[in-house]
Amino acid sequence: MMSVRTDLLLAVLRDTLAATVNFIMLSTANQEVYDPAELHLGDSALVVDRAAHQIFQANLLAHPGTAKLDIVATVVGEEHPYLPDGIRDGQLLVLLDPADGSNQWRCQRAGWCTAGIVVQRTGDGWRFVTAFSAAPDGRLFLLREDGAVLIGSTHNAIMAPFRGPTPPNPTKEHIVAANAYKHASRHLTAPVFDALGDDWFCLTFAGNPAVMNLLTYDTDAVFNPNPSSVWDTAAVMIAAHTSAIVGSIDGEIWTPQQLDELFGSRVELDPATCQFVPPYVAAKNEQLYREVVSAIKAGLASGS
């Protein structure tokens, strides 16, 4: 195993993420003032995705710390699913989702984040190094190589290991977020919402932004009934290193080591095969995880 200057890598990622998030937040499209009830489905999510990818890559390569790290010059991921030739043993590769939740951004300029993972080339395979996620409100999550989760802000360099439990939900109802904003997913999530009952408040967005809310806000659980790409589950990999519970929709709880081996060390960019991460549930504790898993099983059995 080749060593990585992890602290330097995380510092470079923090600065690069700050520049990317600020670019999106300060863009002309983001600054336009809309009626809160008005949806803007004509605004292309691809525009912000592609621009953010270019900004991330440009700032990563321009960072003075990058010269001290052996990083592949091409950032790959959702907006550039092409692995460059000539990657050497020991080099670092960034897999990026530049604006995860771009459909939320398109509709309301909220509910998105910039996220991804970093892997290292090792012979014919890859080794997971870190995962990262940054939200427009400045929240920044980074995973240190020793498994400690660093939570801080993109606006300053202060980062602290996350050691306590995820914050409790102060409201009467539990809150669950599910990947159901697309029509194709609604038939999978609607029966689950029904099975959870009136004690649960259901939100129809998921992915990295929702898992970030699980760790720092009042969201109790997140589930995605669909397979996803590894850059879509960066925050899930981070959550597994905290007191949160992450597992399959069948009730199998995944350890951080399992996630690293099964998902974090695999590089698959072909759009036809890159969604190899199975459906998942993340929750603040095991009781909530089991409750959502039971609702998923009941919902699937209902045949709705």
Residue ranges of model-derived segments:
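N-terminal subdomain of lithium-sensitive/metallo-dependent phosphomonoesterases centered on the IMPase/IPPase/PAP
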Residues: 1-99, 293-304
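Short, surface-exposed beta-strand-loop junctions and turns on beta-sheet-rich folds
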Residues: 148-149, 155-159
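Short, conserved micro-motifs enriched in small and acidic residues
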Residues: 43-51, 106-108, 205, 229-233
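An extended, acidic
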Residues: 17, 145-147, 162-304
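Fold-independent oxyanion-binding glycine-rich loops
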Residues: 78-80, 97-99, 135-137, 179-180, ...
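Exposed regions on extracellular, virion, or secretory-pathway luminal proteins
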Residues: 70-75, 83-89, 121-125, 135-139, ...
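A broad structural signal for short, well-ordered beta-strand segments within beta-sheet-rich domains
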Residues: 72, 125-130, 198-199
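DPxDG-like acidic metal-binding loop motif
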Residues: 87-150
